[in-house]
Amino acid sequence: ASTGLNEKQARAAGVAYDKVVTYSASHASYYPGARNMTVKTLFDPASGRILGAQIVGFDGVDKRMDVLAAAIRAGLTDEQLTELDLAYAPPYGSAKDPVNMAGYVIENVRAGLVEQHHWDAVAELPADGSVILLDVRTPGEVRKQGLLRSDALHIPLDELRGRLGELDKGKKVYVNCYSGLRSYLACRILSQHGFQC
């Protein structure tokens, strides 16, 4: 489902935009039947105003699309998305709805808490050892899906604090995981220890 501008339309219209991609459960994950949804949200990097969104998923996609369509029409910003008080009951939604989560991620990007790089830019990263591509997924995920690139260093997030000595502070670190949450947490840990992430 889609509402507002997509990337192609924004580029064609000369609209400045950035995007975040979030992965959330359709309702409280501890309640049976929750399914993942992928939410791509376009926003104005200067003001945080929401410009467009696309969602792929199953249950609850229509509900989130309606909220985002209204947010775009009302000119809401990332900060206002985080404050939306949306319906919550474990079978139907989470305390922090996928729409709220998109707002939080946009806030973090705009505040400079994390520098995001999307999956399609990984091939452009130098493979000469001048940067570190760090994979923080679990060993099981890496066994099942493989590393993003053969030169990636695998340190699961749960082990990162104890293995910081394996990383070179003189090299920029690019972090990947399955959904972005662990990459964000890893970058916060690394930044707090003097790494450029």
Where are these regions (language model features)?
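Cysteine-centered nucleophilic/redox motifs
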Residues: 10, 179-195
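A short, well-structured juxtamembrane/interface segment
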Residues: 113-127
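Hydrophobic anchor at the start of a short beta-strand
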Residues: 17-18, 152, 173, 197
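Flexible, glycine-rich terminal cap/loop adjacent to redox cofactors
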Residues: 2-6, 11-112, 148
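Hydrophobic/aromatic residues in well-formed alpha-helices
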Residues: 10, 81, 121-122, 160
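Short loop/edge segments at beta-strand edges and connector loops
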Residues: 21-23, 117-118, 156
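Positively charged, proline/Ser/Thr-rich regional signature most characteristic
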Residues: 124-177, 185
